[in-house]
């Protein structure tokens, strides 16, 4: 009897996308699964047919061979011109058995043991917490061993035997021509076990969804994007396998005063017009509290002051960066008539021949403008 076209089995056209193939397989496999159609030989055969089609169409290499040669690509010794001979009747299953055993966590007759999944948790902290270090309590959604059955998946007193179909490996290996493929055992769903009476709490899975509370110690100096690995705090493994890890990804909130660049902190410090001209002493904020900073006379906007060791300590070297303060001279606003009059008098006293002495930048700028227009006038003549 001729085999059905694999695309037809999955209800697809030949040009179907990878996602279309996956969706069709999941839908049909669920519909015709033996557990949902107990005692139905027709459903069992259909399920095998669906798995066989997906094993080929779900693999890029096999699909390409099938598209070119059809079922002949997977018949022993035929279809691909050159692959049929040269191996002296070698058993490809034996040749690749060890490889597949390593990949899928067990060889023939051994129960499949799968490490638990790694989990990710995104944690937002303040800049102060990032710089100083802290401890945060978090709650994660994870898979834990079922307390009712101890992770076995079986009710107490129920027999747990090796799956007779896959002999405990959890996978079925098939040889099709020069291809060797493995798929999850449809009888035990990959567990490698045959359970007489599945646990009612976990439905035979051995694991249950659970919320778990953890305390995470955040070291000083972390930054956005840093990951903290908590070994063994991920999802529980299957069949007694070790749990995965939990990765806590740090996100540092923006600060209303400081900006961070590596180990250095930056902030803008406004000072009055008078302090900028005459000099004085001001207080600037740091993450350790207020610190006094001397402002020399004639300080301009943009002047940088470096406060060494007031930045962030490196998580590797422990060396602390600096706090860099950028001065911004603030123009006075909401002036009274008297204050405006005083400023007019000051402006008048600074004008004239002494402008270059009191305002060198303004004087230089005005001289540059005058020369520009003088040269412009000469070029027009």
UniProtKB/Swiss-Prot annotation:
InterPro entries cross-referenced by the UniProt entry: DnaJ (IPR012724), DnaJ_C (IPR002939), DnaJ_domain (IPR001623), DnaJ_domain_CS (IPR018253), HSP40/DnaJ_pept-bd (IPR008971), HSP_DnaJ_Cys-rich_dom (IPR001305), HSP_DnaJ_Cys-rich_dom_sf (IPR036410), J_dom_sf (IPR036869)
Entry's Gene Ontology BP terms? chaperone cofactor-dependent protein refolding; DNA replication; protein refolding; response to heat
What is a single cellular component term in the Gene Ontology annotation? Answer: cytoplasm
Q: Where does the record place the J domain?
A: 5-70
Q: Does the keyword Cytoplasm apply?
A: yes
Cysteine pairs bridged by disulfides in the record: none
PROSITE patterns named among the record's database cross-references: DNAJ_1, DNAJ_2, ZF_CR
Q: Does the keyword Cytoplasm apply?
A: yes
Which amino acids does the record list as binding Zn(2+) 2? 163, 166, 185, 188
Q: Where in the cell is it found?
A: Cytoplasm
Give the keywords, sorted: Chaperone, Cytoplasm, DNA replication, Metal-binding, Repeat, Stress response, Zinc, Zinc-finger
Residues binding Zn(2+) 1: 146, 149, 199, 202
Co-factor(s): Zn(2+)
What are the CXXCXGXG motif repeat spans here? Answer: 146-153, 163-170, 185-192, 199-206
Record note on cofactor? Binds 2 Zn(2+) ions per monomer.
Zinc fingers (CR-type): give the ranges: 133-211
**Which Gene3D superfamilies does the record associate with it?**
DnaJ domain, Heat shock protein DnaJ, cysteine-rich domain, Urease metallochaperone UreE, N-terminal domain
Report the domain of life of the source organism. Bacteria
Q: What NCBIfam families does the record tag this protein with?
A: DnaJ_bact (TIGR02349), PRK10767.1 (NF008035)
- Complex formation: Homodimer.
Q: What is known of its domains?
A: The J domain is necessary and sufficient to stimulate DnaK ATPase activity. Zinc center 1 plays an important role in the autonomous, DnaK-independent chaperone activity of DnaJ. Zinc center 2 is essential for interaction with DnaK and for DnaJ activity.
Physiological role: Participates actively in the response to hyperosmotic and heat shock by preventing the aggregation of stress-denatured proteins and by disaggregating proteins, also in an autonomous, DnaK-independent fashion. Unfolded proteins bind initially to DnaJ; upon interaction with the DnaJ-bound protein, DnaK hydrolyzes its bound ATP, resulting in the formation of a stable complex. GrpE releases ADP from DnaK; ATP binding to DnaK triggers the release of the substrate protein, thus completing the reaction cycle.
Query: What name goes with this protein?
Result: Chaperone protein DnaJ
Species this chain originates from: Haemophilus influenzae (strain 86-028NP)
Query: What taxonomic lineage is listed for the species of origin?
Result: Bacteria, Pseudomonadati, Pseudomonadota, Gammaproteobacteria, Pasteurellales
